[in-house]
């Protein structure tokens, strides 16, 4: 499956008197020891944040010098629209003192993230593109993809994933390297990010065949952590802002896991900048409200459909789902000039990111209006979905 899983946080929290909430892990053995994500309250000024960070650095240095303990302190700092946060490695005494600071909203332990196995079926038929360009299911007689020749030109898509093989010839030079929050390698070792990017923008299998892909690598193997993903979002927002592209940018996150306030807040604040944020619902057939960033209302949450316009057996569902898109046996790119087939809500989200970029270019609308527009255009075609789940299936408004 193409969905990236993350270990869950329980809804329970450790209450500290007159202090910020420290979320408690559901599976303690899966937490990265002494690593935390600290999120500040909305409205904290840059000056106050800088002062707080300096205080933490000084306190951490003093504590560890006094007790001769190794430690890293603050490692990464995030500033995503209204969200100010940082991650790092702290001992229990330090984190309890941080929690008592009045500007701190909540603290989460950093957790391991793992990517699930990906199935590959060579030479399988591609069907997602023709399906999203017609109102009625015509797959038995039609394999043509109908789209406007603008094809998303002028739109940037940040693929927050395992990396992208930017040299794959099917990208026609439109894929570029952005950053990595996990290592210095520009290689997509797993192929997941390349496949996702190919569905979004490749010449042969892409929904929006003229957009620019920017690779944001947050996985170096099958595990990563929340702080790496949030760091990728932070970089994408800053890069887009620097280039005056916020309202013309898409963030695709074909990943997720146990519900996380920090992850949701990062996704929400990316949306608030003007970007279109598309995320996968999850590859476990349960309520998507259990997952993040799928449970974030400002993210466009995508469930997977099959060739018969039914909810895919593996797809998450529920009121958090905004739209369905093709997600089973999807043919796209894999590294080293190859092609392959994968299934998952990751692939469904990629279709929506591509369609979002396409509509942004065609209708000249900002990214943070795109999810509602896609839902307006979508057809009530899903013939079998779970209770309280939309029946809306992605449609690119081709007129067919």
UniProtKB/Swiss-Prot annotation:
Query: Which superkingdom does the taxonomy of this entry point to?
Result: Eukaryota
Major location category of this protein: secreted
* Entry annotation: catalytic residues: 161, 192, 346
Location(s), subcellular? Secreted
GO terms (BP aspect): proteolysis
Keywords, sorted A to Z: Glycoprotein, Hydrolase, Protease, Secreted, Serine protease, Signal, Virulence, Zymogen
Q: Does the keyword Ribosomal protein apply?
A: no
GO CC annotations on file? extracellular region
One example of the protein's molecular function in GO is: serine-type endopeptidase activity
User: What's its job?
Assistant: Secreted subtilisin-like serine protease with keratinolytic activity that contributes to pathogenicity.
Name of the protein in question? Subtilisin-like protease CPC735_013700
């Amino acid at each position: 499956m193409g969905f990236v899983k993350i270990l869950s946080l329980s809804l329970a929290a450790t209450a500290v008197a007159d202090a910020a909430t420290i979320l408690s892990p559901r599976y303690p053995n899966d937490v990265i020891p002494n690593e935390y994500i600290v999120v500040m309250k909305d409205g904290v000024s840059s000056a106050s944040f800088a002062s707080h960070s300096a205080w933490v650095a000084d306190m951490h240095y003093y504590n560890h010098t006094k007790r001769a303990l190794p430690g890293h302190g603050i490692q990464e700092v995030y500033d995503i629209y209204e969200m100010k946060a940082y991650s790092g490695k702290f001992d229990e005494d330090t984190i309890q003192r941080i929690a008592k600071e009045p500007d701190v909203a909540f603290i989460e332990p950093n957790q391991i993230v793992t990517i699930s196995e990906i199935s590959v079926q060579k030479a399988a038929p591609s069907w997602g593109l023709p399906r999203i360009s017609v109102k009625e299911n015509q797959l038995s007689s039609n394999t043509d993809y109908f789209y406007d020749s603008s094809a998303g030109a002028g739109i940037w898509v940040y693929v927050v994933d395992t990396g992208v093989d930017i040299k794959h010839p099917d990208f026609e030079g439109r894929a570029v390297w952005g950053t990595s929050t996990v290592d210095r390698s520009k290689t997509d070792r797993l192929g997941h990010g390349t496949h996702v990017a190919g569905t979004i923008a490749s010449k042969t299998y892409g929904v929006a065949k003229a957009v620019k892909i920017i690779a944001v690598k947050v996985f170096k193997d099958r595990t990563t952590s929340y702080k790496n993903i949030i760091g990728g979002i932070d970089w994408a927002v800053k890069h887009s802002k620097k280039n005056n592209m916020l309202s013309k940018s898409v963030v695709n996150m074909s990943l997720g896991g146990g519900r996380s306030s920090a992850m949701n807040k990062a996704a929400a604040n990316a949306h608030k900048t003007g970007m279109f944020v598309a995320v996968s619902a999850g590859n476990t057939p349960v309520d998507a409200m259990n997952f993040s960033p799928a449970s974030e209302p400002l993210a466009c949450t995508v469930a997977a459909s099959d060739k018969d316009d039914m909810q895919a057996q593996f797809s998450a569902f529920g009121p958090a789902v905004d739209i369905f898109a093709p997600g089973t046996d999807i043919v796209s790119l894999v590294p080293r000039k190859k092609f392959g087939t994968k299934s998952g809500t990751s692939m469904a989200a990629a279709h929506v990111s591509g369609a979002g970029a396409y509509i942004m270019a065609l209708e000249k609308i900002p990214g943070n209006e795109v999810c509602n527009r896609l839902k307006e255009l979508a057809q009530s075609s899903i013939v079998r979905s779970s209770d309280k789940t939309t029946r809306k299936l992605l449609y690119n408004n081709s007129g067919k």
